[in-house]
Amino acid sequence: MEEREHVVGKSVKRVDALEKVTGRAKYTEDLCDKSAYIARVLHADIAHGIVRSVDTSEAQKLPGVVKIVTCFDVPKYYFPTAGHPWSTDPAHQDVKDRLLLTEHVRFYGDDVAAVVAENEVAAAQALRLIKVEYDPLPFVLDVQKAMEEDAPQLHENYPGNVLKHTSIHKGDFEKAKEEPGLIKVEGWYQTPTVQHCHIENFICYAYMEQGRYVIVSSTQIPHICRRVVGQALGIPWGNVRVIKPYIGGGFGNKQDILYEPLCAYLSQTVGGRLVKLDVSREETFVCNRVRHAIRTHLISYVRPNGEIAARKAECFSDQGAYASHGHSIGAKALGSFPQLYPCENFEGDVYTVFTNKPVSGAMRGYGIPQAMFAMESHTDDIAVKLGIPPYEYRWKYLMPKGYTDGFSKNVNYYDTFRECMEKGSVSVDYERKRREYAQQTGDIRKGIGMAAFWYNTGVWPISLETSSCRMVMNQDGSIQVQVGETEIGQGADTAFAQMAAETLGIPFDMVHVMTVQDTDVTPFGLGAYASRQTYMAGFSIRQTAELLKSHILDTAVEMTRQMKENLDIIDGNIVRTTDGSVLMSLGELATEKLYSLTNCGHLTAESTYQIKNNAYSFGCTFAEVEVDIPGCRATLTNIVNVHDCGRLINPALAEAQVHGGMSMGIGFGLFEELKFDEKTGRPLNNNLLDYKMATFEDHPDLHGEFVENYEPTSAYGTKALGEPPVCSVAPAIRNAILNATGSGLNELPMNPHRLFVKFREDGLI
């Protein structure tokens, strides 16, 4: 019998590769008609206050100005913006705290008015002529100062500016810490506000057609966007159609509803005409979303052998001005502390707090990069204090094989951490270098460090996980695949095609995935976030492919008079399994079925799969640095990430994901920070000149390694990889600097200024 050719596990070329490298791929900007009106938003130039009046008289006189809308004109339907599945239980719904435009300004850059004009010049000039009078209010930028009794209040329903507070208790921390002979290790760890910096800034355009709102947007979450636009405008959700073309990156920023509702509303105000609303890079930094800056206080009581007797964690998560994804980021961060190094006596609290800063939302890693910086820096601090090699300490106390999380019921099926550590250690020659670097003196010193991470796949059991898929056989026997999960540049469509081809038994190039999603056409799906794409979509793809394959074989039975159990699809052909003979191609079968004068039919299948699983992804980072102590500079010279993300659907895509995440982690660790003027609340470096992203000169060669352990809860054995690569990079670099100098920095980024302060504090300079 003919052997089936496997597609899953091969580095096939991306389905969108040619379109993108030749410039033929159509992004939102490319699809918008040149006749579109241009919309621009007027942003507040104070950090906190009430809009007293908006004078648009001079702006209205400008030629080309079509419409000006102020915060006093818009409908008062409060809506959420987080890209989460909706809940029918009001207690579990996202916070509705946004209006299209606001009278109560809560951060420097808040939206107070909008202009619709015939062209860019008229729109820009009109913004400059609008005069806004404010009643200024005190503002607060520090997360813990915002919790003080006399701090200015941002939202009347949230006293103390606390959006939400969660506590975790396991065992008896207070009793356990009194055990004689324990060693106390304590530290504060701070991560910065950073921005996603995807290549394509947010853009959308909207128009009305047959009484419905049509929105084309660079969103990660088209079906969720549809719902939120309906909520924001107070209209039935079915009156909204959202189309997602190719996207130039999102990293979580576009997992929020940004300006789609406002754009739709502006179209309505000009008679349903086409209106385009895009934002500049400067606006993207401030008026979209940023990563939560989290301040973490860790206290560990350990026995002399390193065993953790008791641990306490406090996290203060800077939410910025509005709820967005809110407490879910801080809660996920806190939940990691008792799991990475299991501790029987744990006490933890996380506070998500409003401040007068840009809104924090989803960003690659969703709280885990912040948590891993604190946890893995703290772990090295423990190891150093006890005189235990950090590698040896982790080997002994990281989550063991068989560990089961009491909440999610996730199981660590393999001894993954140690497999990843061993592979990474060999790759960088870790033990030899630790011994060699221990003998260093002088101003220039080398160091090597490591850090581990874990990451959940998707959001179950916190929230809904579901995936839908539709497959249609074309006249030539090829298969059209429509999935609710979205391609946002990560290569998801290629993985979808590989999985579909694998189950159907057809060549990869016979699968066509619909990358342009349309809520009027595409099956319902939750979108791209939580590293869920391949894991979640895999369930509905496999289920739908099995249904379609069964329909195809039923048709083959009709045409060949063979028994169904003796038929299979191999390499796009109907094959008799008893002798391996090819009876017909799928093209012949499809044509015959579609055009039969006696029994014509269109072969399709559609299904929804509700997922009630989750899966741990694991891994670690090894980093090497060269530190110029007098110059207060740390140069990254080598870095290796090792991942267990289950079975690799496409090894080349997996490696690309790892490289991208490592690059983001390098920026997070060494360079990036959005700064604010303490006197005005104004952002100081919201541009790519002053916001220091890592460049090629700052990167050594990036190395990704994999430990492939088949994930038993997964349809194809795979699990999260999109976000994990960023999680452990910053603490690995920090620990390498600690190894080189004996100084451990507890605040990111580890730039020359912070190195100078720390080195001087520790007597190195």
Regions found by a protein language model. Name each.
Residues 18-19, 128-141, 220, 227, ...:
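Extended active-site and interfacial segments that coordinate phosphate-rich ligands
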Residues 103-104, 236-238, 243-244, 269-280, ...:
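Conserved catalytic cysteine-centered active-site region
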Residues 71-72, 234-239, 268-275, 304, ...:
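C-terminal catalytic domains of large/alpha subunits in multi-subunit enzymes
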Residues 85-87, 179-194, 277-285, 326, ...:
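Short Pro/Gly-enriched beta-strand edge/turn motifs at strand-loop
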Residues 1-159, 187:
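Flexible, low-hydrophobicity surface segments
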Residues 148-233, 398-478, 684-696, 703-705:
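Helix-loop-helix junctions that connect adjacent transmembrane helices in secondary transporters/permeases
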Residues 246, 250-277, 492-500:
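Thiamine diphosphate
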Residues 10, 16-19, 89-92, 160-204, ...:
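Glycine-rich loop/linker segments at domain edges
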